[in-house]
């Protein structure tokens, strides 16, 4: 009896229950960690995008960006080709300009050489057409010096005559005369002043460079009228102060003289 009790106590009869419980625990633990782990695979990302409305919008934007990228690549290629064409054109123009510069520079040199040759040939031709004198006499006598001196003297005389004629013509030409148009207000003493006599007295003032013009009577007030008269004067010959002094000398008729308007002509 005692032996049976000992054997039964050493056997764990409920061990399978604990094993099942432990297995279930670890299975639940592993399933929970797998569900919390993010899906990083391309298939899961594609399925997530296809299953959501935002994913379709993002896909459309990506497609548009790809199209824009392709169009930009095309534009860049066109620009590169245009730049290459311009560079080739510039190189061609530089080569052509370099080839033309020596030719253009050589043309003045050719002209100078032709002139020098002409100058050298002309005395030789004149010597060949000479009177046949000896070489020693030709060395002592200047055949062309006298002619050149006569030509220089003739040219100087003609130039002096032309300058003299120009100076005379310029001296005879009248210069610009500065003139002014003046409107004078001549005021009488009272309404009993004879305005016709007053105007007659004013017009008796005569000076070199003074020309009287039209006139009229302008009412002032209380039956009094003033004489408004126009005149043209040369600025260098007639001054306004002198003109006013000459008019105010007729003190029996003239009270004062004022300048109503002054204009340069």
UniProtKB/Swiss-Prot annotation:
UniProt-listed PROSITE patterns: EF1BD_1, EF1BD_2
Sorted alphabetically, the keyword list is: Elongation factor, Protein biosynthesis
Q: Which GO terms describe its biological process?
A: translational elongation
Mark out the compositionally biased spans (Acidic residues). 130-153
Any one annotated GO CC term? cytosol
Record-level Gene Ontology MF annotations: guanyl-nucleotide exchange factor activity; translation elongation factor activity
Name the source's superkingdom. Eukaryota
| Annotated region described as Disordered, given as residue ranges | 31-64, 118-155
> How does it associate, per the subunit comment?
EF-1 is composed of 4 subunits: alpha, beta, delta, and gamma.
| Protein name as it appears in the record | Elongation factor 1-delta
Q: Which organism is it from?
A: Xenopus laevis
